[in-house]
Swiss-Prot record:
InterPro entries: AAA+_ATPase (IPR003593), AAA_lid_3 (IPR041569), ATPase_AAA_core (IPR003959), ATPase_AAA_CS (IPR003960), FtsH (IPR005936), P-loop_NTPase (IPR027417), Peptidase_M41 (IPR000642), Peptidase_M41-like (IPR037219). Zn(2+) binds at residues 408, 412, 485. This is ATP-dependent zinc metalloprotease FtsH 1. Residues 24-92 are extracellular. It is found in: Cell membrane. Homohexamer. It comes from Symbiobacterium thermophilum (strain DSM 24528 / JCM 14929 / IAM 14863 / T). The active site is at residue 409. Residues 1-2, 114-594 are cytoplasmic.
Length: 594
């Protein structure tokens, strides 16, 4: 900022600066000044154009404006003993020219200052062309495959890459070519970054880590320069691993989207393709990339010879979750009463990051409660916090809202018990959690299922609408409390019609991208509406058939606010595992199983 201050002072001096004598001089009339000259009071005079500065013998300074055409005054001054000095006046044209250049210079200085700041400090524009990757040298990436649990299939696929980095000559002698690139795809939190670090740690090679967004900049050519710099560093450090996280920010499909950054992004992708073509597997540089959205990647990036191997990293199954929990429990004081197998059973769909967060939340709750170790109550409370959007809020709802919430959650619980097959009801509560006034929680009791039939999807749709149906059945009207249920029901109906081919009228077509035109969109919209309406009728029929159970469950919720699964089954007089199946109307209006 020093040069800013200097520029400001210079501008002030140019605009407002004056000689010190002029700042102290007192103006005097021309006629009075002539009298002072004739009285020999003036000792010195300096004439600058029409301006005269006079130093009097008594030490004062006066300034006089000379009349036009006054040529005899210098002779008069010398005649009465005054010394005269002539000063050439400043050129006003040159001064105006200087003022004209000052604003552009100030603007240019501001741009340079802003560029230095956005480029990361003292490096300036040169910093933008440097590799954004962080280098982990051998030994710094202390993670190994032993620290990665629940991903046995993916680890087995990566083992030959590790062997190649350790003993490349064995593969070269056989004429085998190791994959140049490995793409890890899967939902967030499943361990893609951890796998890449473990790969480098296991092989004992340097590890370059960067994010796809690090290569994208405002200035044209910066992304391509950074890609070149990264691969230049990698070649010098070979054998090594280059890891690019969130590669969809860097290698998104070309030709999609518009705007000023499109050309820059395409230049960056082209440079990545050139670099991956420019080295062979013998150099020992292996590119590992991770993404949550492989569908948006450019096809040229995915072709063989670039990313040869595509590995899907899914959320772990029950056995994998138990292994992940065991890894995260190593550094925690976990009570013997906490069975990790039971925690794994209660957490279907959880990723590795979710499980780590669950145990950390339980540890925080144990510290808050003053416990010496993490017990089952803390784990159960942490699970409730994670699944229901936070701890119970200390909000006392109005009596009418509590009644409506009780019937709403009782409807969900009763429909879930009737329709969910082997799933187990964990709890139902009307204590406010997150943004809702209550929630109902089910968990898979047996093996997890990955393929769902049309009947499964329709039953789930019916359960989502059962809370709203219970409000309408008992209280006569619905409320805004079903907004989240409606959002999820709409999404499920859309999947059934446009992706899964579960509508008899639309048929086995995938209309996700609506390539069939407006008529197909209209028919799909009509099919979705019919499906949701049928599910709502089915939910109402189910609750009408078990109206007494609905009333008992709602009354118990109003009294106790929270009921565990076994308590609900006892209240409804169900034997453990019994499911009161009810035949309901399907989306076409006929009766029967779906």
């Amino acid at each position: 900022m020093r040069w800013w201050a200097g520029a400001a002072l210079l501008l002030a001096a140019l605009l407002f600066g004056r000689p010190a004598a002029a700042m102290e001089a007192q103006p005097v009339a021309y006629s009075e000044f002539i009298q002072d000259v004739q009285a020999r009071r003036v000792a010195y005079a300096r004439i600058t154009g029409q301006r005269l500065e006079a130093a009097y013998r008594d030490g004062t300074v006066r300034v006089v404006t000379l009349p036009p055409g006054e040529a005899r005054l210098p002779l008069v001054l010398m005649q009465y003993g005054a010394r005269v000095e002539f000063v050439r006046p400043a050129d006003p044209i040159a001064f105006r020219t200087l003022l004209r250049f000052i604003p552009p210079l100030l603007i240019l200085g501001a741009i340079l200052w802003f560029t230095r700041r956005t480029a990361g400090g003292s490096g300036g524009l040169l910093t933008m062309e440097q590799s954004p990757a962080r280098l982990y040298r051998v030994g710094e990436a202390s993670v190994t495959l032993q620290d990665v649990a629940g991903l046995d299939e993916v680890k087995a696929e990566l083992q030959e890459v590790i062997d190649f980095l350790r003993e490349p000559e064995r593969y070269r002698a056989m004429g085998a070519r190791i994959p140049r690139g490995i793409l890890l795809s899967g939902p967030p939190g499943t361990g893609k970054t951890l796998l890449a670090r473990a790969l480098a740690g296991e092989a004992g090679v340097p590890f370059f880590s960067a994010s796809g967004s690090d290569f994208v900049e405002l200035f044209a050519g910066t992304g391509a320069a950074r890609v070149r710099a990264l691969f230049d560093r990698a070649r010098k450090a070979a054998p090594c691993i280059v890891f690019i996280d969130e590669i969809d920010a860097l290698a998104r499909r070309r030709g999609v989207g518009a705007g000023g950054g499109t050309e820059e992004r395409e230049q960056t992708i082209n440079q990545l393709l050139v670099e991956m073509d420019g080295f062979d597997s013998g150099e020992g540089v292996i590119v590992v990339a991770a993404t949550n959205r492989p569908d948006v990647l450019d096809p040229a990036v995915l072709r063989p010879g670039r990313f040869d191997r595509h590995l899907t990293v899914d959320p772990p199954d029950r056995k994998g979750r138990e292994q992940i929990l065991a890894v995260h429990a190593r550094e925690k004081r976990l009570s013997q009463a906490v069975a990790l197998a039971e925690v794994a059973r209660l957490t279907p769909g959880f990723t590795g990051a979710d499980l780590a967060n669950l145990l950390n939340e339980a540890a925080l709750l144990a510290v808050r409660a003053g416990e010496r170790e993490i017990g089952w109550p803390q784990v159960a409370m942490a699970l409730e916090r994670v699944t229901s959007g936070g701890p119970p809020r200390r909000v006392r709802a109005a009596a009418a809202d509590r009644v409506r919430a009780a019937y709403h959650e009782a409807g969900h619980a009763l429909a879930g018990l009737a329709l969910r097959g082997s799933d187990r009801l964990v709890r139902v509560t009307i204590l406010p959690h997150g943004r809702g006034l209550g929630h109902t929680l089910f968990r898979d009791q047996d093996e997890e299922r990955y393929l769902h039939t049309r009947r499964d999807a329709f039953d789930r749709l019916t359960e989502l609408l059962a809370g709203r149906a219970a409000e309408a059945l008992v209280l006569g009207e619905v409320s805004a409390g079903a907004a989240d249920d409606l959002e999820r029901a709409t999404g499920l109906a859309r999947e059934m019609v446009t992706r899964w081919g579960m509508d008899a009228d639309i048929g086995p077509l995938r209309l996700e991208h609506a390539v069939e035109g407006e008529e197909s969109l209209r028919r799909a919209d009509g099919a979705m509406r019919a499906l949701v309406a049928a599910a709502e009728r089915a939910a109402r029929a189910l609750l009408e058939a078990r109206r007494s159970g609905l009333e008992r469950l709602a009354a118990a919720l109003l009294e106790r606010e929270r009921l565990e699964g076994p308590e609900v089954e006892a209240l409804l007089e169900l034997t453990p595992g019994e499911k009161p199946y009810i035949i309901v109307a399907n989306s076409r209006g006929d009766e029967g199983n779906q």
